[in-house]
Amino acid sequence: MGYNAGSYDVIVIGAGHAGCEAGLAAARMGSKTLMLTINLDMVAFMPCNPSVGGPAKGIVVREIDALGGEMGRNIDKTHIQMRMLNTGKGPAVRALRAQADKFSYQHELKKTIEETPNLTLFQGMVERLIVEDGECKGVITQAGAEYTAKTVVITTGTFLRGEIIMGDLKYSSGPNNQQPSITLSEHLEELGFDLVRFKTGTPPRVNSNTIDYSKTEIQPGDDKPRAFSFETTKFIMDQIPCWLTYTSTETHRLIDENLHRSAMYSGMIKGTGPRYCPSIEDKVVRFNDKPRHQIFLEPEGRNTQEVYVQGLSTSLPEDVQRDMLRTIPGLENVEMMRTGYAIEYDAIVPTQLWPTLETKKIKNLYTAGQINGTSGYEEAAGQGLMAGINAACRSLGKKEVILGREDAYIGVLIDDLVTKGTNEPYRLLTSRAEYRLLLRHDNADLRLTEVGHEIGLITEERYERFTNKKLQIEQEKERLSSIIIKPRPEVQELIRNIGGSELKDGIRASDLLRRPEMTYEHIHLLVPSEVELSDEVKEQVEIQIKYEGYIEKSLQQVERMKKMENKKIPVDIDYDAISSLASEARQKLKDVRPLSMGQASRISGVNPADISILLVYIEQGKIARVSNQ
């Protein structure tokens, strides 16, 4: 027998990285929000790698922060180490990566959620949605509680019909031996959603006291203070190193001899695994010419001896895992504390979503995170933030927010999912972004703070600091463009000392900065600014001047693309009425139902000829008959 448990503007199912961002965003925007999760002790839990950031993913964390999300602030308070990656490469691929104290990360984020006005956190398992006339009206829990809501966001991670697999051992479970969500998965199928079966995995954890670190290579954090959040002013300087070692020929021999016992190769696993995070069995089989593979030993926190063995994700049986660990230099006498495992779970086919992450089948229902077919905490958090924003906008009667591919990696991620779909766990890569020179780590605030402020997630105080930073950047660029540096002896000496060609004539300071060997600090020595500028402002001035030509080229590409994005396609267009479309294109267009010509052009199976035909119909006003007429 059910009972009425309350009414809310937004209900979030799940409290992982997607759920936390969704719940916090909705509540901070003024929506009365309820977060329901199976286990309150597992809020913001990191079931796999104890880290945040990395290539592309680190930029997503910066974008989350620029929009007013929480992940960046939280990892800045709880990391044990932070490093800037790809510093020897161009600014487009630089990214921050933090090693997390996973327990502090959980504790801090749960505390933030508990202290947030408008936000209620409750332990309960959702089994069904309340759906009336094609609209989601609320949820029903295992205990019979009926909660009504204007909007619902599902962020169930890998819990949907989750199964843990090690060798020939297989049992129903969520990550880390949590209770799985079985009934909700079945209910989504009843509602007509297409689900797919995906797989991911995690490596064993070992006892730090039993590692011989003298046989490994130290991997320290950066000496320079780093932060994901643009608001962070206090930095953690007491960092803990990670350690690098390698598999051995003995490791590979042991794996080869036990492949028949791996769930990956015995046929036990049916789900599709992540291409960019393969198991150690996969690496040994697919790259059998490599004598060794990197293994990083990553502490899971400051107050635990557990160490995450990155690079050794596996579904081999427990006894093989133990023996395999002891073939690795430094781990000869190691004690395993937790076994690695593979986990299979249900995910929704993401082409069933609008770019707002609302489902097409059921109005007011949103999904975010691994349920949408992605992998990674950062991808989940970015989706959770956008789903929470849009669910709140709907509940408050405001216009929903869609980030374009030119705006953010989050925009690339969501557009890829809803337009192209994915047949494997999707991981964000810099190569997926065609405008990656515009989507940099350093300029996330310049790209997205206006959006965050407009929707109410950025405070006035922070917005004022942001506008002041923008003003300083423009003023310094103008100053350097107006100053002529003459070939004085001290100028020529500095240029010679850094390996440059001496000046023949006077040159604008901005033009001198464009030289590859010159930095802003060199220019500052020659023509110092009267105003004290932050490192962030100096960095922006240097990047914007040095890469001006390339940035301008990218902006021109964006403008051309926007012409296609601005050509809207009616939501209720009937593609069956456009007889000249190729049959594959017609089916794909019906499945995805793109909102613009730009989105239509990115659908696999829709070729330029189909786009031209569709364009004629749209531009001439010959809209195909509407299905419901």
Curated annotation (Swiss-Prot):
Binding of FAD, residues: G14, A15, G16, H17, A18, G19, V126, S181, Q370
Binding sites annotated in the UniProt record for NAD(+): 273-287
GO molecular function: flavin adenine dinucleotide binding
Record-linked SUPFAM superfamilies: FAD/NAD(P)-binding domain (SSF51905)
Main location: cytoplasm
Compartment(s): Cytoplasm
Keyword Translocase: no
Gene3D superfamilies, A to Z: FAD/NAD(P)-binding domain, GidA associated domain, C-terminal subdomain, tRNA uridine 5-carboxymethylaminomethyl modification enzyme MnmG/GidA
Keywords of the record: Cytoplasm, FAD, Flavoprotein, NAD, tRNA processing
Known function: NAD-binding protein involved in the addition of a carboxymethylaminomethyl (cmnm) group at the wobble position (U34) of certain tRNAs, forming tRNA-cmnm(5)s(2)U34.
Subunit composition and interactions: Homodimer. Heterotetramer of two MnmE and two MnmG subunits.
NCBIfam families linked: mnmG_gidA
Protein's name according to its UniProt entry: tRNA uridine 5-carboxymethylaminomethyl modification enzyme MnmG
Species of origin: Bacillus anthracis
